[in-house]
């Protein structure tokens, strides 16, 4: 599935303009990020792409068709939104019942429902958790259960609202690993809204910076993270790895304590190591 967003303006009911001049595309099989601070409009943008918000000036095309011209059931068979708080999405008593709700509602036979649930739970590393009660899951497991519910319905596109929010550093990394695996191995197109900058350059194909309802920068992460001053102007910072690379390229080096190397020697060693890693 391919998204083409040309959003001229969206305003809240009180007239406050939330989004304006938003233009970007998401290709089939792409892992795309929308990076912005809290209140920048990320969640609102995802809801527009999912068809939950339909009153706006502009267009959002899904495979060339305006999402507002599609019936909700037609959108939800292919595109799924995962909310930031999994408790807003999970409702059943057990993991199986929650993940099975979508396929059952689509009319699949019970044997097919069971097979879809098993495949989906295995895909999100929750195999064997079908009988668990939802409230016994950890926060990270709940997020995975939400993803499983959409995979069981056969969704080709996942819109993820802050998927790493509320997770510890290891949980954040594992979530990004999961999404990357779904994208690279299963071919799921993913659009991820986030305010976390450090994991972004490691996984995404393309990144857009959203500030005050406008996209101010976009492209591959390695191109986006080349302007520290511009990042600071939108209340964001460079990822630690990008900051290190920037300092190595544009300053005298990065000082390290307790090292037998001079700053210049350390700089050369690190740059050589980075080149070796790339090759």
Curated annotation (Swiss-Prot):
GO terms for cellular component: ATP-binding cassette (ABC) transporter complex. It is an enzyme of class 7 (translocase). InterPro entries: AAA+_ATPase, ABC_transporter-like_ATP-bd, ABC_transporter-like_CS, ABC_transpr_CbiO/EcfA_su, Co_trans_ATP-bd, ECF_ABC_transporter_ATP-bd, P-loop_NTPase. Its EC number is 7.-.-.-. The keyword Magnesium does not apply. ATP binds at residues 36-43. It comes from the Bacteria. Keywords: ATP-binding, Cell inner membrane, Cell membrane, Membrane, Nucleotide-binding, Translocase, Transport. It is a peripheral membrane protein. It is found in: Cell inner membrane. One of its GO terms (biological process) is cobalt ion transport. PROSITE patterns: ABC_TRANSPORTER_1, ABC_TRANSPORTER_2. Residues 1-237 form the ABC transporter domain. One of its GO terms (molecular function) is ATP binding. Probably part of an ABC transporter complex. Responsible for energy coupling to the transport system. Belongs to the ABC transporter superfamily. This is Putative ABC transporter ATP-binding protein GSU3001.
């Amino acid at each position: 599935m391919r998204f083409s967003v040309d959003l001229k303006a969206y305003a809240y009911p009180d007239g406050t303009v939330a989004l304006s001049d938003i233009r970007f595309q998401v290709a089939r099989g792409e892992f795309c990020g929308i990076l912005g601070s809290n209140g920048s409009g990320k969640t609102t943008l995802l809801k527009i792409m999912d068809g939950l918000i339909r009153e706006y000036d502009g267009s959002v095309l899904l495979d060339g068709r305006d999402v507002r011209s599609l019936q909700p059931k037609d959108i939800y068979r292919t595109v799924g939104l995962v909310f930031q708080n999994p408790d807003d999405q999970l409702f059943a008593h057990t993991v199986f019942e929650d993940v099975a709700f979508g396929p059952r509602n689509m009319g699949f036979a019970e044997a097919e429902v069971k097979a879809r649930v098993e495949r989906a739970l295995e895909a999100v590393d929750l195999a064997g958790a079908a009988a668990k009660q939802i409230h016994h899951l950890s926060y990270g497991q709940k997020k995975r259960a939400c993803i499983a519910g959409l995979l069981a319905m056969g969704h080709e596109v996942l819109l993820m609202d802050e998927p790493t929010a509320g997770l510890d550093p290891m949980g954040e990394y594992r979530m990004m690993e999961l999404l990357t695996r779904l994208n690279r191995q299963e071919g799921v197109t993913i659009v991820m809204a986030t305010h976390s900058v450090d994991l972004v350059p490691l996984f995404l194909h393309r990144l857009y910076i959203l500030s005050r309802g406008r996209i101010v920068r976009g492209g591959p992460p390695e191109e986006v993270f080349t302007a520290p001053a511009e990042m600071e102007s939108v209340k964001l910072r460079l990822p630690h790895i990008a900051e290190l690379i920037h300092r190595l390229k544009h300053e005298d080096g990065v000082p390290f304590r307790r090292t037998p190397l001079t700053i210049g020697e350390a700089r050369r060693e690190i740059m050589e190591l980075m080149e070796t890693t790339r090759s």
